[in-house]
Structures are given as C-alpha cells and as structure tokens.
Amino acid sequence: MKPSKRRINVWITLTGLVVALVASHKASAQICRPVSERTGELGCWITAHTVLEQLPSQSIFWHLDTYPTRAAAEAAQGPRGTVVESLGKVWLLTIEGAGWRPSGGDRIAEIGPLPVTAATNYSAQYMEAIFTPGMTAPAHRHSGPEAWYTVAGETCLETPAGKMVGRAGGSQVIVPGGPPMHLTATGTEIRRALVLILHDAAQPPTTPAPDWAPKGLCRN
C-alpha cells in the first residue's frame, strides 16, 4: 500500500522539525575556542593560557585588576600574572596568595581560596564568556578548579552535588576539579564573565563528560 501524499507531507514536516530542534540545540551548546577564531560576540573564547608550574604552599587566590593601558598592566605583571584585553578593559589576572597586590591599577576582585594541591604543576586558562539566556555548555569536567568573575547576567551550574548560581555582584562561584558539570546562562540579561580554569598542566583543562547526565536543575 502506497503512503498517501498527506502522510508524506506530515513525515517531511516532522523531519524538518527534528532537524531544526537538533540544529538549535547544537547552536546553543557552546564550546570554548581560541579568541583568534572569533567570528562574533557570543560564545566562549580562550583569551590566554599561562604555565604556572608549582604554586606557593599557601592559600591561592585569583586576583583581578584593571589598567588604563596594556603597557601599564605589563609593567605591573608578576611571574604568575597574565595580561588580557577582555570585555572592553585591560586586565591583569594573577594567581597568588591572599592579600597580594600589584603596583597601580584598580583592584576588581580577589576570588578564592582555590582548591589546589601543592605537588601539582598548574597552568591557567583564561576565557571570556558571553551567553544569551538559555545558552549552555555541554556536560564536561576540568582537571583543576574553575572560577568565574561575572560582570553582567546570571549563570547556573549543575553538578552531581546540586546547583550554584553566579550573578554580577553576588557570591563567588568556585568548582573543584574532577566532578562533571553543566552550565546554563539564566535570568534575563546577557551573561558576560571572565573565567579561570586552573588546571593540572599534565592534563587537558577540559574534557567531555558523556558518562553523566544533568537533571535539568538549572531549568527550575
């Protein structure tokens, strides 16, 4: 029995909807790429990657300072500092102990302590994330702690332990290395954030987590 023309049209319509939904999901799931590959504002962009090796045997923090020019930031840069231009500003991003201060500049934040181990050599990967509400990152894990500095908007992160929300001016979000996670931009404003992955230098900073499925806690 030949399928009717109407049934064929229904199949075509349903197939088109499925393709559109899959394409939409792929478009909303963001993978971080080098800033040299940037083609637009939205997305997750790797702005710098710095080898730090072993860290001091004390509580470790991420220090964020801004400067009027790149030259001024580079003049204040220490051995564990990185200068990036991101979100319209020149930043000196430094991994050091509590209370550390560079010369000059404007202190923006001190985030930590970061959960690190004394015997591990570390590298710092810095990123700029600009997500519209609803955009996500695929389930993944890191080989060291991740921290955000949220300039605008809101981000919800689900892990097996539950969820945490980062907002501009809100409490710090620090995630230890190892557990899987799934990130979603929430709220009503575009998320703009600086991101640090302080990872084991002998391992990739980020790996997919196909062995874990989020419960959708960030949709509630």
Regions found by a protein language model. Give the residues of each.
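Short, low-complexity, Pro/Ser/Thr/Gly-rich segments in the mature regions of secreted, periplasmic
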Residues: 206-220
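Ligand-binding loop in jelly-roll beta-barrel domains
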Residues: 85-90, 156, 176-204
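Bacterial N-terminal signal peptides that target proteins for export
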Residues: 2-13
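Glycine- and acidic-residue-biased ligand/ion/polar-headgroup-sensing regions
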Residues: 143-162
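Boundary at the C-terminal end of the N-terminal hydrophobic targeting segment
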Residues: 27-29
